[in-house]
Amino acid sequence: MIELTALAIALSMDAVAVSIALGSKCEEEIRQLALKAGGFFGVAQMVMPLLGFYLGVQLHDYIGGIHHWVALGVLGFLGLKMIREATQGEKELALSSHPSSSKLLLLAFVTSLDAMAAGLTLTLLGLPLWFCLLFIGGSTFLLSFGGVHLGRKSGTYLEEKAEYLGGIILILIGVKIFIEHS
């Protein structure tokens, strides 16, 4: 359960960083934006790992004996990518103070691509898939909701720190899985 909690927090950090950025630009209707962003990001973080999980099931015969290497590679790559983006300040989409639903959907998709890749590793947690998906999605909703409010109060200061922390957590989970299954 500790691994799932760490994974959920790490995967949600891109969404949290975007939520903080959205909140920093929000001039009014903060609660509505927080609910909307949390909803979009939470659902995307449930769906994308499911797609990754089913991709992993299809590839099981090919990667079954080296799954711990795959987990280390995928999570390590994603973690390093998040750290690089945080340190270089890369932003993929310009944010406005009133993002449309289509813009939020696009942001949710972009921020959940890492979750799809991480879905390949969900079987290694030894927990029911539905529980993992609900936990990851629910955690992302709550953290994104809070991120919008936090962004309103802190501006963009915390945005890159959230991505940096998420990257470190993903790398540590990958190393832990590798050590446990080697």
Swiss-Prot record:
Top-level division of the source organism's lineage: Bacteria
Family: Belongs to the MntP (TC 9.B.29) family.
Predominant location category: membrane
Matches recorded under HAMAP family: MntP_pump
Protein name per Swiss-Prot or TrEMBL: Putative manganese efflux pump MntP 2
Keywords noted in UniProt: Cell inner membrane, Cell membrane, Ion transport, Manganese, Membrane, Transmembrane, Transmembrane helix, Transport
Originating species: Wolinella succinogenes (strain ATCC 29543 / DSM 1740 / CCUG 13145 / JCM 31913 / LMG 7466 / NCTC 11488 / FDC 602W) (Vibrio succinogenes)
Membrane spanning stretches: 2-22, 37-57, 63-83, 104-123, 127-149, 162-182
Role according to the record: Probably functions as a manganese efflux pump.
Keyword Cell inner membrane among UniProt keywords: yes
Compartments, as annotated in UniProt: Cell inner membrane
Cited InterPro entries: Mntp/YtaF (IPR003810), Put_MntP (IPR022929)
Keyword Transmembrane helix: yes
One family name in Pfam for this protein: Mntp
Recorded GO CC terms: plasma membrane
GO function term, MF aspect, one: manganese ion transmembrane transporter activity
Membrane topology: Multi-pass membrane protein
Residue stretches in coiled coil: none
